[in-house]
Amino acid sequence: MRLVDLLKGVKHEIKGNPNVDISGVCYDSRKAKPKYLFIAIKGFKTDGLLYVEEAIKNGAVAVVTDRDISEYPGVTVVLVEDARAAMAKIASNFYNNPTSKLTLIGITGTNGKTSVTYMLKAILEQQNNKVGLVGTIQNMIGDRVIPTTHTTPESLDLQELFSLMVNEGVKYVVMEVSSHSLALHRVDSCDFDIAVFTNLSQDHLDFHESMEEYAKTKSKLFKMAKKASVINIDDKYSSMMIESSKGKVLTYGIKDFAYVMAKEIKNSLSGVKFKVQIQDKKEEISLKIPGLFSVYNALAAITVADFLGIPLRSVREALSHVTVKGRFEPVETGRDFYVFIDYAHTPDGIRNIMEALKEYEAGRKILVFGAGGDRDKSKRPLMGEVAGKYADFCILTSDNPRSENPKEIIAQIEEGIKKTNCPYVVIEDRREAIRYALSNAQKDDVIILAGKGHETYQIIGDKVIPFDEREIVKEILAESEK
């Protein structure tokens, strides 16, 4: 493919031969090969500009950059306004605009993205469609799993994945869209058909300057979706998403009047039942994941299905089987108490999970949690305060401390929990914290291990240590039987 064809739709200046033949594109100099185009993007930890020479040495014949660089003999230099934005368009051109051949559904919001994608995948597959999934836990084509590194991969990886999906006969793609991916142009040049808004609460304020900025970034998705926007009307940021919408707006909710509504909600530890109403249509829905947040997630999926013309009866059948790894996931203990694993790692996430247990009074609600290092620090005391308000007992521990001191992270959570009357202990080692919870559990207690969810590792310093809470619970219980 000629360089000039790859640059269609990209504002640029060229120094060198615009007709040079390009056989591949990369943003990692180690992946450069003869006849490759290297795109120098600025990352969080390093800068592609530092690796231009290495890319050329490995065979790159052209370089895209948004800053001036030295000229290299025989190498074409393309100067653009924003290398990340340019990469998204170049990637789409290189892979022949794969999203134009797919029905692409993007889901954004602080909480619920993963559950909604899995619910939609189940609904669409029940209609015998081949479905692709792009998400936090994994990427999938049908039942085949493709490992992930970010919630949303870089635009080049994403377009390659979409191209693979097209080649394998995928019709629908359900995709989690993070605020980072919108801000960093990773999903530019994605041809979204439907955008879904779940909710917005405090998270990622280490990256976005304020909640308004965070919301504004999320709203970009609704400008991109050409057919429909599906919006949680009960969320205070819904009006911003509605104003940004280009396609048909469909709302869902529980409190305020909406196109799709849930009534007669009955919650228990084993799931939640409710009646869904879409104008004059009604159906009873049964979910295996309990809680009001679960009802909201299902409503989002139901609204999309309704827009796509899928019968409500089929939707009911598909939703009755859905479970999501690390989302209110029960762990079999063989004891007289309960253990659940959940990804809740924000104040709102913790509130949602504890609200789901609100009516449960048979035993104590014990919460084991920490907060991630090198991430939004302002949410830590809020997490402590919310936990203290809802739990009967808390065990403060480590999550993924990364480069931070775990003791300091825990101290910041403590500031919040001290504002409540909730008794708590601090056990920095997460395995020992889980051991303490299990060994002190009484009949009918519910233990929530919050924060890790689907993750099977812990990041301490720069080391990634295997840490699967399902296995750890089993090991500790087996040890106690000896």
From Swiss-Prot:
Pfam families from the xrefs?
A: Mur_ligase (PF01225), Mur_ligase_C (PF02875), Mur_ligase_M (PF08245)
Instruction: Write down the InterPro entries for this protein, in alphabetical order.
Output: Mur-like_cat_sf (IPR036565), Mur_ligase_C (IPR004101), Mur_ligase_C_dom_sf (IPR036615), Mur_ligase_cen (IPR013221), Mur_ligase_N (IPR000713), MurE/MurF_N (IPR035911), UDP-N-AcMur-Glu-dNH2Pim_ligase (IPR005761)
Q: Where is the PTM N6-carboxylysine found along the chain?
A: K218
**Residues binding UDP-N-acetyl-alpha-D-muramoyl-L-alanyl-D-glutamate, per UniProt:** S29, T151, T152, S178, R186
Question: For meso-2,6-diaminopimelate, which residues are the binding ones?
Answer: R375, D399, N400, P401, R402, G451, E455
For this protein, what post-translational modification is recorded in UniProt?
Carboxylation is probably crucial for Mg(2+) binding and, consequently, for the gamma-phosphate positioning of ATP.
Binding annotation for ATP: G109, T110, N111, G112, K113, T114, S115
Top EC category: ligase
GO:BP terms for this protein? cell division; cell wall organization; peptidoglycan biosynthetic process; regulation of cell shape
Keyword terms: ATP-binding, Cell cycle, Cell division, Cell shape, Cell wall biogenesis/degradation, Cytoplasm, Ligase, Magnesium, Nucleotide-binding, Peptidoglycan synthesis
List cellular component terms (GO): cytoplasm
Subcellular location per UniProt equals: Cytoplasm
Q: What does this protein do?
A: Catalyzes the addition of meso-diaminopimelic acid to the nucleotide precursor UDP-N-acetylmuramoyl-L-alanyl-D-glutamate (UMAG) in the biosynthesis of bacterial cell-wall peptidoglycan.
The protein's matches in HAMAP family, at most eight in alphabetical order, are given as:
MurE
PANTHER family reported for this sequence? MUR LIGASE FAMILY MEMBER (PTHR23135), UDP-N-ACETYLMURAMOYL-L-ALANYL-D-GLUTAMATE--2,6-DIAMINOPIMELATE LIGASE MURE HOMOLOG, CHLOROPLASTIC (PTHR23135:SF4)
Q: What is this protein called?
A: UDP-N-acetylmuramoyl-L-alanyl-D-glutamate--2,6-diaminopimelate ligase
Q: Which organism is it from?
A: Caldanaerobacter subterraneus subsp. tengcongensis (strain DSM 15242 / JCM 11007 / NBRC 100824 / MB4) (Thermoanaerobacter tengcongensis)
Q: Which gene encodes it?
A: murE
